[in-house]
Amino acid sequence: MAQHTVYFPDAFLTQMREAMPSTLSFDDFLAACQRPLRRSIRVNTLKISVADFLQLTAPYGWTLTPIPWCEEGFWIERDNEDALPLGSTAEHLSGLFYIQEASSMLPVAALFADDNAPQRVMDVAAAPGSKTTQIAARMNNEGAILANEFSASRVKVLHANISRCGISNVALTHFDGRVFGAAVPEMFDAILLDAPCSGEGVVRKDPDALKNWSPESNQEIAATQRELIDSAFHALRPGGTLVYSTCTLNQEENEAVCLWLKETYPDAVEFLPLGDLFPGANKALTEEGFLHVFPQIYDCEGFFVARLRKTQAIPALPAPKYKVGNFPFSPVKDREAGQIRQAAASVGLNWDGNLRLWQRDKELWLFPVGIEALIGKVRFSRLGIKLAETHNKGYRWQHEAVIALATPDNVNAFELTPQEAEEWYRGRDVYPQAAPVADDVLVTFQHQPIGLAKRIGSRLKNSYPRELVRDGKLFTGNA
């Protein structure tokens, strides 16, 4: 693999020499940083099993190497990356996999280690959505996830990835993560804080990542991280699990932040060792039981992961002064809910008791039941999935609901050819050789639901959302 020139400040190199265990070679560290990052993907098990995914992609000649800490994760090598970007493959467009850096799969593995089965989870800094979607898959779309993102521009990307992966149990918020300790005290079974950091571990992806690096900047970032972990710890219920992670390598933003929390709440913080998380985890293990992953250890990004348990309640923070405002949705009455459920089932949309129907004007939504306890405590950017809009003739079913709820064994499912599926993703109407009989058609490709179409004569009217429409070369190789 080709080398690339990474910018290293002298003070950074000095700091790394001091931080690196004697069992590791500093020359190996420098060499690893100069190598471009291996690409990796995670199979979305909400859509397809790992075995079926491997069978589906076998004809492509992809080399898939298992990632030891994530059984659905693989490093991927492809011969035709320039000819067809990974994000333009049919399997990516239909949500069968997520392009995710291998080391960033570690925090969720830690969160669910030792058969941990949380029902209400918060992802404090969630965009672009790799870890939120990984959490949802581990929860099998059950329970509820609060996915927060402070950056307004990234909330849209977060929602797009959640929708593409067919996730229904997520509520989105847009806050500074420091508000949650006061706003929702002791309400979560598990919390992931993948904290904003100096990004020292990402030089293999971005050779200029350290251009603005300084020890003073690290200190400022660490101060913010301490505030974030304190807030997250207050939002965690006693007995709950908190995973703290960064993609940086200095101890000030990593071990020191966790040790500060333990010093602040000595009777309430228990470090849970990660040495048994996967075979070979002990190579990155610190004396506290954290994983401090230097890039040469597993040939991935530099990363840090700590797992801790809240052993008892801690004094509450002052109640927030802000007003959340009126919640604009109301629950749908049982009789009407039954009619809606029946109509949805007729086009292949079904849901279980984890989701409940709510209404706002002519909009119908499905919210995860587990999030209802947070209503009135925080303001949501988006909650659950939009099921439909009502109109005089019935319901206008929404694309995100189709992707999350439809199953391909529906009587009205209609399998597209590769050329027809490509036309669908380009936002064009489809003219199949043999038109389906039903008026509402669940269109599938590779036996995966990709949308809902209206049959008009011999034409399938495209309903693919305009903001998702793709151009350029797609999976058939035609531009």
UniProtKB/Swiss-Prot annotation:
Active site, renumbered? 247
Compartments reported by the entry: Cytoplasm
- Amino acids binding S-adenosyl-L-methionine: 125-131, 149, 176, 194
Q: Known InterPro entries for this protein?
A: Methyltr_RsmF_N, MeTrfase_RsmB-F_NOP2_cat, MeTrfase_RsmB-F_NOP2_dom, Nol1_Nop2_Fmu_2, Nop2p, RCMT, rRNA_ssu_MeTfrase_F, RsmB/NOL1/NOP2-like_CS
* Record's keyword terms, sorted: Cytoplasm, Methyltransferase, RNA-binding, rRNA processing, S-adenosyl-L-methionine, Transferase
Q: Which GO terms describe its molecular function?
A: RNA binding; rRNA (cytosine-C5-)-methyltransferase activity
Gene Ontology, cellular component aspect: cytoplasm
Question: Which Enzyme Commission number(s) are listed?
Answer: 2.1.1.178
Q: What class of enzyme is it?
A: transferase
Give me any GO biological process, just one: rRNA base methylation
Q: Does the keyword Transferase apply?
A: yes
Which reactions is this enzyme annotated as catalysing? cytidine(1407) in 16S rRNA + S-adenosyl-L-methionine = 5-methylcytidine(1407) in 16S rRNA + S-adenosyl-L-homocysteine + H(+)
Q: What does this protein do?
A: Specifically methylates the cytosine at position 1407 (m5C1407) of 16S rRNA.
Please identify the protein, giving its name as recorded: Ribosomal RNA small subunit methyltransferase F
